[in-house]
Amino acid sequence: MKINTVLFDLDGTLINTNELIISSFLHTLHTYYPNQYKREDVLPFIGPSLHDTFSKIDESKVEELITSYRQFNHDHHDELVEEYETVYETVQELKKQGYKVGIVTTKARQTVEMGLKLSKLDEFFDVVVTIDDVEHVKPHPEPLQKALQLLDAKPEEALMVGDNHHDIVGGQNAGTKTAAVSWTLKGRAYLETYKPDFMLDKMSDLLPILSDMNRS
């Protein structure tokens, strides 16, 4: 089956928000629980929804913690977000070649739009599925299924690209092919344990992979 649709995660995949996310967690946690959390303690928080993460820390303060996190995140967004090499050119080329492209993210829509505008990727994506659009987040298949439905695409004709196991397992649960990115903060070896179909060393690796898949 040929691939005509590519779904991307956003954070850590299309744009480098790692420092923004880590700083947002550290600021919030230091405000409420001074000196209890270090940088390495918050790395596992990257990937799950804010609600899931903060529920495990203090169920009585979840909404308060999310509000604090998002305020810091918005205030410092543009200074801490960076681009990844070859992302813009690759997505531009995919659109030029006629691929359907969408984003499936666990972020809130307002912050997603900030990141897409800053990176100038907003012109390329017709479909962006955020946490505001679904009941279940990745690795549940619902967000991917919603994106595929909106793009009028079939799972077997789609590839999910991401930097976290939520993306890879989410793709597998939805029935798509999967590609992991080696620049993940979690480390290449960690993602390899989830058996993605492909591993990208840079985003432009996608182009020959898709070309080969669609030739066979």
From Swiss-Prot:
It comes from Bacillus anthracis (strain CDC 684 / NRRL 3495). The active site is at 9 (nucleophile). This is Pyrophosphatase PpaX. Keywords: Hydrolase, Magnesium. Belongs to the HAD-like hydrolase superfamily. PpaX family. Its cofactor is Mg(2+). InterPro entries: HAD-like_hydrolase_sf (IPR050155), HAD-like_sf (IPR036412), HAD-SF_hydro_IA (IPR006439), HAD-SF_hydro_IIIA (IPR006549), HAD_2 (IPR041492), HAD_sf (IPR023214), PGP-like_dom2 (IPR023198), Pyrophosphatase_Ppax (IPR023733). GO terms for biological process: DNA repair.
